[in-house]
């Protein structure tokens, strides 16, 4: 392997890790292994700390391929709690409002999901990395400032109801989504809740695929040190 010339690595991001932490962890162990102080490493699509799943990292000259990977379709499996919302649309914040769910049936959920197929407009979450007047939206939102973000067009290629537990004390649904770059599944949860005349937020999110890369193709960052120590390394000094 030649990390300076460029390698593409696939990881299953652990729960609680930021995307930044994954990149830093991988960079540290590559630099240690090949004996350099710095190396360009970047990822092809962030995942929230509370999400898990496929992350593609590029090293060295392969970082030029990041944009290519960003445009690949992504597949997610998401669990939504119905009847309650949070400011961030996930478990990062406490529930701020509750709504009735007694009118929701499996048939209503399935019919509602079809409305999200194809080209749709989506307003990103205030707690997101979108830029507002040169600052990240989440920086403003965490200060309690009002954040107004414009709707963005995106494409939902597939949406499927995998599980529907409406009789539970905290009703949940589990869905599979195949979507384009720029889709916020947290915002999709918000919009599905509203379309059901209720509320919803994300309680679990797994990115199961990016392009042709699936979870079974991925390394565990927590075992990356052991993995890289077993690899045969090319140290071609002409490829800085």
Curated annotation (Swiss-Prot):
It is an enzyme of class 5 (isomerase). Transmembrane segments: none annotated. Its EC number is 5.4.99.25. One of its GO terms (molecular function) is RNA binding. The lineage of its organism: Bacteria, Pseudomonadati, Bacteroidota, Bacteroidia, Bacteroidales. Responsible for synthesis of pseudouridine from uracil-55 in the psi GC loop of transfer RNAs. It catalyses: uridine(55) in tRNA = pseudouridine(55) in tRNA. HAMAP family: TruB_bact (MF_01080). NCBIfam families: TruB (TIGR00431). One of its GO terms (biological process) is tRNA pseudouridine synthesis. Disulfide bonds: none annotated. Keywords: Isomerase, tRNA processing. This is tRNA pseudouridine synthase B. The active site is at residue 48. PANTHER family: PSEUDOURIDYLATE SYNTHASE TRUB1, TRNA-PSEUDOURIDINE SYNTHASE. It holds the Pfam family TruB_C_2. The keyword tRNA processing applies. Belongs to the pseudouridine synthase TruB family. Type 1 subfamily. SUPFAM superfamilies: Pseudouridine synthase (SSF55120).
